[in-house]
């Protein structure tokens, strides 16, 4: 009876050990991933079992998290798991080959394995927590970059529209000024005379700016008045010299003020003094007439040199007339004398 009871107790112990060993490999398969990682990394075998006062370093979290799934896919069987599988297949041989462990030891092993699993799970939980905070910080930075990038593109370069406006604003004022000055000229009789009218006046100057001076009372342009005053002064100077013609001849305005169509104007040729014709008339027997013609020819040349074109022209006409009279009269006198002399001798 004692032998049979001892055998029964041995059989129960073998069954309990086989159950615990079969449960052990399951726990080992589930929890050996991080444990084997710890075994494969010889530099940190003890640092991966944090106590209550020890915290895992966040620097080594990257390689641990990367190595854990690789080891779980290809678990390596330890000699304990190999022995457990052999014992589960043939419990009788296992009981003969190796002494059966006591139930207290078998219970302590699975109890220690869940502790290891909890520690590894706590480490894995702390690892994503340590790696998680940088992610949200990087996302706002990316959002800030994406928000800050469209700003320079959304703001177009400022256009200078005000540069083209000032000339457009000045045009109406200039037009109004020109219109107002044109009306003033028409009302004040300041409109210049056109060519061929026969009246004295300045030539039109379209490119000259409009004069802002008030027109005179008589309606004549100020330039014409100034030239008239100058001509009066010149005429008075000529009247003072001895041997000069009357002052009335030189007091008239010069023909330079007339238009191109007026006689003696800019369009006409330079007036002639007829001094050669006067010299030829001197050979004729009309001495008082030809001498006067020669004097007028000399005066017309002097007036032309001084700029009095009108006076030179008038004096030239007188010299021409007198010289022609002297020539014709002299020729007639010569013919008459010849006829008389030939008739007397016959």
From Swiss-Prot:
One GO cellular component, as annotated: synaptic vesicle membrane
Entry-linked Pfam families: CD225
Intervals, Cytoplasmic compartment: 1-274, 296-323
This protein's UniProt keywords: Cell membrane, Cell projection, Cytoplasmic vesicle, Membrane, Methylation, Phosphoprotein, Postsynaptic cell membrane, Synapse, Transmembrane, Transmembrane helix
Effect of gene knockout: Mutant mice are normal at birth, but display paroxysmal movements at the onset of locomotion that persist in the adulthood. Adult animals present abnormal motor behaviors characterized by wild running and jumping in response to audiogenic stimuli that are ineffective in wild-type mice and an increased sensitivity to the convulsive effects of pentylentetrazol. Although the overall brain structure is not affected by the knockout, the thickness of the neocortex in young adult is significantly reduced in medial and caudal regions compared to their wild-type littermates.
GO BP term, pick one: regulation of calcium-dependent activation of synaptic vesicle fusion
Modified residue annotations for Phosphothreonine: 74, 78
Main subcellular location: membrane
Transmembrane annotation, as ranges: 324-344
Signal peptide: none
GO molecular function list: SH3 domain binding; syntaxin-1 binding
Region (Disordered) location: 1-222, 235-267
Record localization: Cell membrane; Presynaptic cell membrane; Synapse; Cell projection, Axon
Modified residues (Omega-N-methylarginine): 246
Protein's membrane topology: Single-pass membrane protein
Function comment: As a component of the outer core of AMPAR complex, may be involved in synaptic transmission in the central nervous system. In hippocampal neurons, in presynaptic terminals, plays an important role in the final steps of neurotransmitter release, possibly by regulating Ca(2+)-sensing. In the cerebellum, may inhibit SNARE complex formation and down-regulate short-term facilitation.
Subunit structure as annotated in this protein's UniProt entry: Component of the outer core of AMPAR complex. AMPAR complex consists of an inner core made of 4 pore-forming GluA/GRIA proteins (GRIA1, GRIA2, GRIA3 and GRIA4) and 4 major auxiliary subunits arranged in a twofold symmetry. One of the two pairs of distinct binding sites is occupied either by CNIH2, CNIH3 or CACNG2, CACNG3. The other harbors CACNG2, CACNG3, CACNG4, CACNG8 or GSG1L. This inner core of AMPAR complex is complemented by outer core constituents binding directly to the GluA/GRIA proteins at sites distinct from the interaction sites of the inner core constituents.
Protein known as: Proline-rich transmembrane protein 2
